[in-house]
Regions:
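An anionic, glycine-rich sequence signature occurring as long contiguous blocks
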Residues: 14, 139-164, 168, 172, ...
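Electropositive nucleic-acid engagement tracts
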Residues: 25-29, 36-108, 115, 212, ...
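Short, conserved catalytic/metal-binding motifs centered on acidic residues
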Residues: 52, 92-106, 133, 200-206, ...
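Active-site-proximal, Lys/Arg-enriched surface segment
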Residues: 68-156, 161, 292-296
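Short, basic/hydrophobic alpha-helical segments
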Residues: 80-85, 174-198
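Short amphipathic alpha-helical "interface-anchor" segments enriched in bulky aromatics
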Residues: 98-102, 206, 256-258, 329-362
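Acidic, metal-coordinating catalytic cores used for nucleic-acid/nucleotide bond scission
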Residues: 202-209, 229-231
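Basic, amphipathic alpha-helical segments enriched in Lys/Arg and hydrophobic/aromatic residues
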Residues: 355-417
Length: 421
């Protein structure tokens, strides 16, 4: 995008960001925020601090200081962001999606960098991993998507090296937490800011943890998530405590294959999402089961959950899902939420391409969080503008679901400018 095109976006972006001014503490900081977000939206080969500063005509050191130590409250700004999303785009059937994203980085100085699994490359790599929470209205033709929270996953090796943490500006009380615990903290915080989700959904890295389910229950949050085939459940609660194998928990793949409650069912076709090629249909069976108690794995939970087996009739792919939804919730609704995970995958892809989400070159924890916030605000701007230019009203499609051929936040800036003109 040319310098003229960047300037043409500035009034609309400034208007959207105006409500964040109180958290900038100084007028100059608001100017830096605007310059940095505009730079993230620009068509630059690299979207790290130096090329953004050069394109904006700002001193490189100024933007470095803006991210690292200038006095503005990025945490309060993010709280405001969450409240604003609910005020302007809230809907009754909003879905929250948990996922982690890896960013390949060299060296040892970037906070949290380590050889670990990196989804970006599909292998163990030197990378930084973030844990994120996405909000989507799951609209079939123009979904509104934005990431409400981003936090650093701190590896154990970092957590145990407090000197290294101190050099990276990582707080003394910040320790290693598994991604599912970070996700729960993000959800609690968002709920505190008025965010409400019809369902939250996630992959098996979260779903395989019984304690994750019990904590979601404690929050009163309806959820559905994928689980691995060796996840254990109880088909029913034993009448009394028993150590007999026949009364124990079973792998979900074996239960779905051999238990009469599944064998006696016929496969039922369910539309899980709408695509440009028409409805995506999967065959499903479902039953009510008990999970293993997180504190005592040999004991079943008091409450029941849904166990759903879903089969793609075209490829034969099998997925297993657990849901804490009530017995009255339909399979269609549960699977609509379960198959909404694609929104965050596409958001990551577009955010890295369009808004420099993974282009950070920082050495402090605060700088990393601030970069992620600015990138998320850039994506929010695109999503809000796309929705406005297409004549949508927030929450108009609260009862709809499915996949889109185009999605908010996915529009490139040349298209945006053409629509704006």
């Amino acid at each position: 995008m040319t310098a003229d095109q960047i300037r043409s976006l500035q009034p609309e972006l400034a208007a959207l960001l105006e409500s964040f001014r109180p958290y900038m503490n100084r007028a100059s900081n608001f100017g830096h925020l605007l310059a940095y977000v505009l730079g993230l939206l620009a068509d630059l080969k690299r979207k790290s601090i130096e090329p953004i500063a050069l394109a904006a005509g700002t001193a490189v050191r100024t933007l470095q200081e803006f991210l690292s130590f200038l006095d503005w409250d990025h945490e309060a700004a993010n709280d405001h962001f969450q409240r604003q999303v609910m005020d302007r785009h809230g809907c009754e059937r909003a879905i929250g999606v948990f996922d982690a994203s890896g960013h390949v980085k060299q060296g040892r100085m970037t906070p949290g960098v380590q050889r670990q699994w990196c989804g970006e490359t599909g292998k163990t790599d030197n990378c930084v991993v973030g844990q994120h929470l996405l909000y989507t209205d799951n609209h079939p033709t123009n979904p509104f998507n934005c990431v409400l929270a981003s936090d650093l996953f701190l590896p154990k090796e970092w957590s145990e090296d407090r000197k290294r943490c101190s050099k990276a500006g990582i707080p003394d009380d910040m320790v290693h937490r598994p991604k599912w615990r970070i996700a729960l903290d993000q959800l609690r915080h968002a709920i505190g800011n008025g965010v409400r989700f019809w369902f939250v959904t996630f992959d098996e890295d979260y779903g395989k943890v019984p304690a994750f389910w019990s904590d979601l229950d404690a929050l009163g949050q309806q959820a559905i998530g994928e689980v691995p085939r060796n996840f254990h459940v109880f088909a029913k609660r034993p009448a009394c405590r028993s150590l007999q194998r026949a009364h124990g928990s079973k792998r979900v793949d074996n239960l779905c294959r051999f238990s009469p409650v599944f064998r006696n069912q016929k496969w039922r076709q369910v539309t899980v999402k709408e695509t440009t090629r028409g409805p995506a249909m999967w065959e499903v069976k479902a039953a009510r089961v008990h999970l293993t108690d997180g504190s005592t794995p040999s004991r079943p939970t008091e409450r029941q959950y849904w166990l759903i087996i879903a089969r793609n009739p075209e490829t034969g792919e099998i997925k297993y899902f657990i849901s804490n939804a009530s017995a009255s919730v339909s399979l269609e609704d549960m699977l609509t939420a379960a198959f909404a995970r694609w929104h965050i995958e596409m958001w990551f892809e577009r955010a890295k391409q369009e808004a420099g989400f993974g282009a950070f070159e920082v050495r402090t924890y605060r700088s990393l969080l601030r970069h992620w916030l600015c990138s998320r605000l850039a994506m929010y701007f695109l999503a809000a503008q796309t929705q406005r230019l297409r004549g949508e009203k927030p929450g108009d499609h609260a009862g709809t679901s499915g996949r889109s051929d185009q999605h908010a936040g996915d529009i490139n800036l040349e298209t945006h400018l053409a629509l704006a003109g």
